[in-house]
Amino acid sequence: MKLLLAGTPEFSVPIFEELIKKFEIVAIITQPDKPKNRGYSLEASPVKKLAQKYDIKVYDPEKISTIYDQIKDLEFDFFLTAAYGQYIPEKILNLPKIASLNVHGSLLPKYRGAAPIQHALLNGDDETGISLIYMTKKMDAGNILKIAKIKLNGNENADDLFLQMSKIASKNIVLWLEQIYQKDFSEIVQDEEKVSLSPKLLKEDALLEVDKLSVKDFINKVRAFSLNPGAYLIKDGKRVKIFRATTSLVKNAFVVEVQGQKIYCYEYQFEGKKRVKLNFNLLFFNSVI
């Protein structure tokens, strides 16, 4: 089986590494190198580093449409994307012999869009999962081929859930592709009446307005924004980023009072200071259904 892959962040790496071990990868597409250290140098994406590690041809165009002529004559059975980060034109979706597929971080049709994992946390969901779908011209609207559900416990933040979702996808992806290759699957048409969207979380939305949020909403916002850009509040004119918080007592935590109830922030960072991480023994990974 031959594959063309497209992905960018660390989320994609374990998934692609499993595929590299099992199948022939004709090329990998990723986002261009990005500035680091205040723009003085460029850094390759985690997926580009993976491609270089295995000496696989890698493309990193500003727009994927510009490499159409370079990839149109490649022979591959599947085009698989996982957190690539660009809209893919239909002429590229039509290139594989069998299908173009996408690994999406929600139980579709819930949370179509760029930030499904964060929105599951923001809304305090008790269940989420991975969907493997056909890619179509309409974003995240293709038929569902495979799913893996995950129970949420309310303690995990975006960092934890990205890691867990990536592990779940990497554990299943080889078997899923083999089953689809052998036509051992059934399709589920997405119910358009149940569609919800998950737009990218914006920096301007990261402010924790203590006087306007419920305790539950405060904690869920912290969970959702933990990865980037980080939820924050203002104390004595300075920004304090909060990455983990709970209503359970945590010794030496930074305490915030919301609606008359104490919230213990046990991973936080004051402006200009180092990040503080405190032990909280109730934190544990979620379970797979």
From Swiss-Prot:
Its EC number is 2.1.2.9. InterPro entries: Fmt, Formyl_trans_C, Formyl_transf_N, Formyl_transf_N_sf, Formyl_transferase-like_C_sf, GART_AS, Met-tRNA-FMT_C, Met-tRNA-FMT_N. (6S)-5,6,7,8-tetrahydrofolate binds at residues 106-109. It is an enzyme of class 2 (transferase). It catalyses: L-methionyl-tRNA(fMet) + (6R)-10-formyltetrahydrofolate = N-formyl-L-methionyl-tRNA(fMet) + (6S)-5,6,7,8-tetrahydrofolate + H(+). One of its GO terms (molecular function) is methionyl-tRNA formyltransferase activity. Transmembrane segments: none annotated. Keywords: Protein biosynthesis, Transferase. Pfam families: Formyl_trans_C, Formyl_trans_N. CDD domains: FMT_core_Met-tRNA-FMT_N, Met_tRNA_FMT_C. It comes from the Bacteria. Belongs to the Fmt family. NCBIfam families: fmt. Attaches a formyl group to the free amino group of methionyl-tRNA(fMet). The formyl group appears to play a dual role in the initiator identity of N-formylmethionyl-tRNA by promoting its recognition by IF2 and preventing the misappropriation of this tRNA by the elongation apparatus. This is Methionyl-tRNA formyltransferase. It comes from Mycoplasmopsis pulmonis (strain UAB CTIP). The gene is fmt.
